């Protein structure tokens, strides 16, 4: 169905940190929402790129050669195979 998906409503349905929830699927891709605070492990994805979009708050992503910051309304594409470690000092989604 072509019904709008309300992010605020979807975020209100869970509290777990670092536990992505699938909200839609398209072709071979899943759209996920996640709440974060603190650090995640350094990792990579061998088969696919990964997109981070910040709806509220801010986060950083550490790469091997730099650290970037994403603020509310910003996004970044992490290329497949690129090692990265996402983290957020305060509650972010």
Where in this protein do the model-derived segments appear?
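Short strand-coil-strand connectors
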Residues: 27, 62-66
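Conserved small/polar residues in nucleotide/adenosyl-binding loops
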Residues: 92-93
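Conserved short histidine dyad/triad with adjacent acidic residue
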Residues: 30-46
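A cytosolic small-molecule/anion-sensing beta-strand core signal
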Residues: 27, 55-56, 72
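Short, conserved beta-strand element in jelly-roll/cupin
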Residues: 36, 46-60
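Short beta-strand His + acidic residue motifs that chelate non-heme Fe in jelly-roll/DSBH
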Residues: 43, 61-62, 78, 83-89
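A short, N-terminal "cap"/entry segment at the start of jelly-roll beta-barrel domains
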Residues: 1-32
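Short acidic-glycine-tyrosine-enriched beta hairpin
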Residues: 65-80
